[in-house]
Amino acid sequence: MTNDKEKRLKELNRMQYEVTQNNGTEPPFQNEFWDHKEEGIYVDIISGKPLFSSLDKFDAHCGWPSFTKPLEDEEVAEKVDKSHGMVRTEVRSKTADSHLGHVFPDGPGPNGLRYCINSAALKFIPKDDLEKEGYGDLKHLFD
């Protein structure tokens, strides 16, 4: 992963690097996926690991893509974040150790969680491209 990660880091734009590597936050309502409605999955921009599904995406009116849950809990790590004078729960990708965003206890659904994720940390794979992009095992989500 180290060589792959180094290669992928060099391919990131400034915002993607700032968010994923320096725990940055992109501007609300001015990012690629905040209002994105196409069916598919969102993967870690660095590792390519599947993180979230459009089926779990909802409009939280916060300006960032929001999800009720990750695709697989094993790929998302939570960490206490005491920056900016508050205590929050940071969300990171386990494989690439990239900053993704934060999770808050104010979401809809049975778990009541809102995963507020930076678009800059994600790559979207449309459901019709899952097989072609190597995520064919997740096609069943959209049947």
UniProtKB/Swiss-Prot annotation:
A Pfam match: SelR
InterPro entries: Met_Sox_Rdtase_MsrB (IPR028427), Met_Sox_Rdtase_MsrB_dom (IPR002579), Mss4-like_sf (IPR011057)
Domain MsrB per the UniProt entry, residue ranges: 5-127
Reactions catalysed according to its record: L-methionyl-[protein] + [thioredoxin]-disulfide + H2O = L-methionyl-(R)-S-oxide-[protein] + [thioredoxin]-dithiol
GO molecular function terms noted in the UniProt entry: peptide-methionine (R)-S-oxide reductase activity
Single GO cellular component term: cytoplasm
Taxonomy, superkingdom: Bacteria
Active site: 116
Keywords: Oxidoreductase
Gene Ontology BP annotations: protein repair; response to oxidative stress
Enzyme Commission number(s) of this protein: 1.8.4.12
Coiled-coil blocks: none
Family: Belongs to the MsrB Met sulfoxide reductase family.
NCBIfam families given in the database record: peptide-methionine (R)-S-oxide reductase MsrB (TIGR00357)
Protein name: Peptide methionine sulfoxide reductase MsrB
Naturally occurring in which organism (per UniProt): Bacillus pumilus (strain SAFR-032)
Gene responsible for this protein: msrB
